[in-house]
């Protein structure tokens, strides 16, 4: 993927940044693509850096992701909760699966979606092979993970565990308005002036 470069004029001349570094100067982190360990490490490093730089200012996490590895997502979620800075989450395009949990895990009152965003919640998926006991262990682990994810979503949305369990039984797609009504986000951003 070609990463655009931004050129800025400074007192010492011109300075070129890749677009993501330039956005980071404005406390903006882009979470796009599949959630995996590499993405998580990058996002976590940026969260920690911005929090150390100024923990009184908000961090803006823009999310456009189909989801991915749960442990990678939970590492980011734990870091979002660990740092002092408020983390505004903004869905752009798609926030699905683990990405929807990260969207809902932003600072309450500061979780947003753009009007044409799609949000998807569902139960964790996985597979196992090997001996029967190994398959049983893997099955128990995915059930434990599902309970954990349901609790995280219930805490973030105000929905009951029973409702979350029912709604995540199959893919549950939501528009920005439906996600707001459900409690996954707090507001819909039509333009930057409506952002808090």
From Swiss-Prot:
Major location category of this protein: cytoplasm
EC number: 3.4.21.92
Domain of life: Bacteria
Example of a GO MF term: serine-type endopeptidase activity
Compartment(s) where it occurs, according to its Swiss-Prot or TrEMBL record: Cytoplasm
SUPFAM superfamilies according to UniProt: ClpP/crotonase
Family: Belongs to the peptidase S14 family.
UniProt function note: Cleaves peptides in various proteins in a process that requires ATP hydrolysis. Has a chymotrypsin-like activity. Plays a major role in the degradation of misfolded proteins.
Name the record gives this protein: ATP-dependent Clp protease proteolytic subunit
Source organism of the structure: Lacticaseibacillus paracasei (strain ATCC 334 / BCRC 17002 / CCUG 31169 / CIP 107868 / KCTC 3260 / NRRL B-441) (Lactobacillus paracasei)
Organism classification: Bacteria, Bacillati, Bacillota, Bacilli, Lactobacillales
């Amino acid at each position: 993927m070609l990463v655009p470069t931004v050129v800025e004029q400074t007192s010492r001349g011109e300075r070129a940044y890749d677009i993501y570094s330039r956005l980071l100067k404005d406390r903006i982190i882009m979470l796009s693509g599949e959630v995996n360990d590499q993405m998580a490490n990058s996002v976590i490093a940026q969260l920690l850096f911005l929090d150390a730089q100024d923990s009184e200012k908000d961090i803006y996490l823009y999310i456009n992701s189909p989801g991915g590895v749960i442990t990678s997502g939970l590492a980011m979620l734990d870091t979002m909760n660990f740092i002092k800075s408020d983390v505004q989450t903004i869905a752009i395009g798609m926030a699905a699966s683990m990405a929807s949990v990260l969207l809902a895990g932003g600072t309450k009152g500061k979780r947003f979606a753009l009007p044409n965003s799609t949000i998807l919640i569902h139960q964790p998926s996985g597979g196992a092979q090997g001996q029967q006991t190994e398959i049983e262990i893997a099955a128990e682990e995915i059930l434990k993970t599902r309970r954990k994810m349901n609790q995280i979503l219930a805490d973030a949305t105000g929905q009951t565990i029973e409702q979350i369990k029912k709604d995540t039984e199959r893919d549950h797609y939501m528009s920005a308005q439906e996600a707001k009504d459900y409690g996954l986000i707090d507001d819909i951003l039509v333009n930057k002036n409506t952002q808090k």
